[in-house]
UniProtKB/Swiss-Prot annotation:
Residues 84-87 are annotated as: Involved in Mg(2+) ion dislocation from EF-Tu. PANTHER family: ELONGATION FACTOR TS, ELONGATION FACTOR TS, MITOCHONDRIAL. This is Elongation factor Ts. Disulfide bonds: none annotated. The keyword Protein biosynthesis applies. HAMAP family: EF_Ts. NCBIfam families: tsf. Associates with the EF-Tu.GDP complex and induces the exchange of GDP to GTP. It remains bound to the aminoacyl-tRNA.EF-Tu.GTP complex up to the GTP hydrolysis stage on the ribosome. Belongs to the EF-Ts family. It comes from the Bacteria. Its main location: cytoplasm. InterPro entries: EF-Ts_dimer_sf, Transl_elong_EFTs/EF1B, Transl_elong_EFTs/EF1B_dimer, Transl_elong_Ts_CS, UBA-like_sf. The gene is tsf. GO terms for molecular function: translation elongation factor activity.
Length: 312
């Protein structure tokens, strides 16, 4: 059995927000395994925070660019990391992120974008190398996303923009369908703001990682069994919790932040009826700078979005 040291207890306490004695008990029960102990605490209803292990701090910018293509659109989003927040306000860095985002319009994936040329002919990887030498900070293209629709729109949204199309959170939402592109774009922007606020994990239940669902099911089952209720009742309790979980993390099933009385799926269907043509959300991406890292209070995104749209 692994020794439960004071350092292990301290680490688990910092990651879970649970008291020292409960952390020690969790570690004893799970042979000193931090991740297993966090799951154990969650199952007991003690953990105040989700797993926070293996998360890397990052600064820099998320950049977005959108290009009209006939009746459709192409859009790209990139996350370029740097060492300090100060660099996000540097014009050279901002210009570089915009160039990298534009390279993402015709190239998909970090590797392809890194090997591609910017609009002025410089290879993206060389651009970053030169910028590192000039500014003296390490920089890296961490993530990218690209959407294209032949008919419809790809809407974008930057939360708390540092400069036009640059900020700490960038969202793209691709909607396919015929009709007034301006209205489709308006719908897409509302959904993009919703995505920034709620951070859904998937577009539909089928897209959600089944391992994540089973993990939640196991935790919910352990919690329900502690109630002492009959197995049939426990099963219903668990299924109810799973439905609620999906409503919280699946975009189309979420309550729309600007009108909680309807889901995003219902919002899209209603908009399609108004346009006289069905609309389909083909995909979305939410790039948050240094995603998953706690850096202190950041405010309530849902409340901010509602306030910005006059829904508060």
């Amino acid at each position: 059995m692994a020794e439960v040291t004071a350092a292990l207890v301290k680490e688990l306490r910092e990651k879970s927000g649970v008291g020292m004695m409960d952390c020690k008990k969790a570690l004893v029960e799970n042979n000193g395994d931090i991740d297993a102990s966090i799951d154990w605490l969650r199952a007991k209803g003690l953990s105040k925070a989700a797993k926070k292990a293996d998360r890397v701090a990052a600064e820099g910018l998320v950049g977005i660019v959108v290009r009209a293509e006939g009746a459709g659109m192409i859009a790209a989003a990139v996350e370029v990391n740097a060492e300090t927040d100060f660099l996000s306000r540097n014009e050279l860095f901002q210009t570089a992120v915009r160039k990298i985002a534009r390279a993402g319009l015709d190239n998909e994936g970090v590797e392809a974008i890194s090997a591609a040329k910017t609009p002025d002919g410089e290879v993206v990887s060389d651009l970053l190398t030169h910028l590192i030498a000039t500014i003296g900070e390490n920089m890296v293209l961490r993530r990218s996303a690209r959407f294209a629709v032949a008919h419809g729109a790809v809407a974008s949204y930057i939360h708390n923009a540092t400069a036009p199309d640059l900020g700490r959170i960038g969202v793209l939402v691709a909607i396919e369908g015929a009709g007034d592109q301006t209205k489709i774009l308006e719908l897409g922007r509302k959904i993009a703001m919703h995505v920034a606020a709620t951070a859904p994990l998937s577009l539909s239940p089928d897209d959600l990682d089944q391992a994540a669902i089973e993990k939640e099911r196991q935790i919910f089952t352990e919690q329900a069994l502690e109630s002492g209720k009959p197995p049939a009742v426990v099963e219903k309790m668990v299924e109810g919790r799973i439905r609620k979980f999906l409503e919280e993390v699946v975009l189309l099933k979420q309550a729309f932040v600007m009108n909680p009385d309807q889901t995003v799926e219902q919002l899209v269907a209603e908009a399609g009826k108004e346009l006289g043509s069905p609309l389909t959300v083909k995909g979305f991406v939410r790039l948050a700078l240094g995603e998953g890292v706690e850096k202190g209070p950041e405010g309530d995104f849902a409340a901010e979005v509602a306030a910005m749209t006059g829904q508060a």
